[in-house]
């Protein structure tokens, strides 16, 4: 009986471990240097995705002591970038990536489920990110 429980536990752990990489590869947002700019990137791993710059709902800048510092997003065609001041140490942001639903063929469409025929999975993707450019105090 103990051996059966042990095997069941190992099987459960293996199934959970296989599910984690898919979760870890979800789209995220972060700042990265692109050419001569600090650009807000939305993507997964190596892949940058185009996005609607109007999806940025909140952006807050902080210095090393977490005092507010002005940070203004600058719009590109399908991205945002910032020009950090010398005292900018961290940036918090919130982004509404919109609704996404799969269609009957499994393709992802940027619409809510009730607008996509045959959809079985949908999401309203909200992204939150804290980005550090310099060390901060505790």
Each language-model region and where it sits:
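Bacterial N-terminal signal peptides that target proteins for export
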Residues: 1-10
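Bacterial N-terminal signal peptides
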Residues: 10-19
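Sec/Tat signal peptide C-region and signal peptidase I cleavage site
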Residues: 20-26
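Generic low-polarity alpha-helical segments
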Residues: 1-2, 15, 25
